[in-house]
Structure formats: C-alpha cells, structure tokens
Swiss-Prot record:
Organism for this UniProt entry: Vibrio vulnificus (strain YJ016)
Protein name as catalogued: Large ribosomal subunit protein uL2
UniProt xrefs under PROSITE patterns: RIBOSOMAL_L2
Cellular component GO terms held in the UniProt record: large ribosomal subunit
Region ranges (Disordered): 223-265
Pfam annotation, one family: Ribosomal_L2_C
Annotated SMART domains: Ribosomal_L2 (SM01383), Ribosomal_L2_C (SM01382)
NCBIfam families linked to this entry: rplB_bact
C-alpha cells in the first residue's frame, strides 16, 4: 500500500493523492457474485429528490458481499483481493473447501493464500468470524452484528474497528470508533481484526470531476439562494445568513441532536464523543 502524490502535469492532476495497492486484482470481478446496480439520482418512487447531491457517476455492478459468514467449520482460502466501487473497504474473494466462492470485507493484513474460518471453534485470528460470546474481552473486531443472524452492520468501512470491552450475561459491550459504548447480544457475530485500506482517508480527489465520477453532485450554500429556497437566502448583498445555521427545512445543524429512536436508548452505555 502506497500513498502517491501525482505530478502537476495539468490543473486536474496537481492536487491528486492516490492510494495504490499492488496486491489488488487487476482483472474482472467474479461474475456469479455480481448484480445490477441501478442509479436513482437520489429520487424515490414518486420521482422526488429525497437525498440531495446525488446523480450521474460511472456505471457499477454490485458485488454481493457475505456479511453473515454462516458457513461454519468449512475453511476458506483467500484467492485474491479486489477493489469494490460500492464501498471504501477492499473485498476478498474466498474459496471454501466445498467449492463455493464468496466475497467478504478484507481485514487489515489479509493476503492471497490466507485461510479463514467461521464458527464457534474458529481460532482467534484476523478474518475469522465468531459469535461474540466466544471472542476474548479486549479483542479488536469489525463487521459486528446488531441482531444475530441479520448480518454485519457496524464497523464495515475502510479502517473501521470496534473493541469488545466487557461481557455481561447475554450481552457484550463494545466501544466504537466514535467513542460510543453500546451493548449488543453476545450471540451476534463479529470478525476478528480491523477493516483494511485504512489509508483511504488520506486520498485527495484533486478536482470536482472526480466527485462527479462517483455520483456526487455539488453542494450549494444556503446564503447564496433566494428566500423561497432556503432560510438563509435573500438579503441585499452578501450576508451571513442572519441566524444560527439551519438545514433547508429549518432544522438546526452543527451539533443539534436528531436521534429519536428511544427504543434502543437502553443499549447505549455511553454516548459518542462530541
């Protein structure tokens, strides 16, 4: 893995910083694990924009990633590491002893030829998946299930991890990167180690077009809009908005709490760091 700063051969290359991984597969992905991935431009079934700043971008296939890791007791050999355009982490194509191939999130340090396993008897080794009741306290984990059998939901992006800090009855307590500590059922599964490609955060796209390739459209500031379009809009000449920052719908931003799921509050031991 190397961080490469491009030579300023043009204005669009001047600020580009790339993450280069020579270990990634340079050919086509494994076709049986590809699915159609249609774009919706941030619009719902009524054609209305529900998520702003989405549109365009390069065509992509979805890689079907195994987030459940339920093939217990069957060892799998890592065939290759691959780039995945749908996520910041890299993925690994693994071949199970029974002949089945699956994609998984590639943890830090994984290489082609490694052997991984899942189940209660799997050794404590990066890339192996176990129920959290079988993982030692203090271990670094990723791809954590919130609901047993549903599949991993936490710590899935590049460089992400959580730490298992306590075990209490049918629950374990984990500490997330944000500083939040929460309880999850100990029957849920997690994978040992942290997600690879942690250098992803160091990249610089270098130009607006690189964002457009990724399907990200520009963000227009509210203070340059008209009053009909945004609470900060209007005024004679350049203004500061005249009020505390709000969203286009008048909801305060910059630190305003919007969490409303009181049903799961009891599982949060400590709120995330500010």
């Amino acid at each position: 893995m190397a961080i490469v700063k491009c030579k300023p051969t043009s204005a669009g290359r001047r600020h580009v910083v790339k993450v280069v991984n020579a270990d990634l597969h340079k050919g086509k992905p494994y076709a049986p694990l590809l699915e159609k991935n249609s774009k919706n431009g941030g619009r719902n079934n009524n054609g209305r924009i529900t998520v702003r700043h989405i549109g365009g971008g390069h065509k992509q296939h979805y890689r079907v990633v195994d987030f459940k890791r339920t093939k217990d007791g069957i060892p799998a050999k890592v065939e290759r590491l691959e780039y995945d355009p749908n996520r910041s982490a890299n993925i690994a194509l693994v071949l199970y002893a029974d002949g089945e191939r699956r994609y998984i999130i590639a943890p830090k340090g994984m290489q082609a030829g490694d052997v991984i396993q899942s189940g209660v008897d799997a050794p404590i080794k990066a890339g192996n998946t176990l129920p959290m009741r079988n993982i030692p306290v203090g271990s670094t984990i990723h791809c954590v299930e919130l609901t047993p059998g549903k599949g991993a939901q936490l710590a899935r992006s590049a460089g992400a991890y959580a730490q298992l800090v306590a075990r209490d009855g049918s629950y374990v307590t984990i500490r997330l990167r944000s500083g939040e500590m929460r309880k999850v059922l100990s029957e849920g599964r997690a994978t040992i180690g942290e997600v690879g490609n942690s250098e992803h955060m160091l990249r610089e796209l270098g130009k607006a077009g690189a964002s457009r390739w990724r399907g990200v459209r520009p963000t227009v500031r509210g203070v340059v809009m008209n009053p009909v379009d945004h609470p900060h809009g209007g005024g004679e000449g350049r203004t500061s908005g005249g009020r505390h920052p709000v969203s286009p719908w008048g909801v305060p931003t910059k630190g305003y709490k919007t969490r409303s799921n009181k049903r799961t509050d009891k599982y949060i031991v400590r709120r995330r760091n500010k």
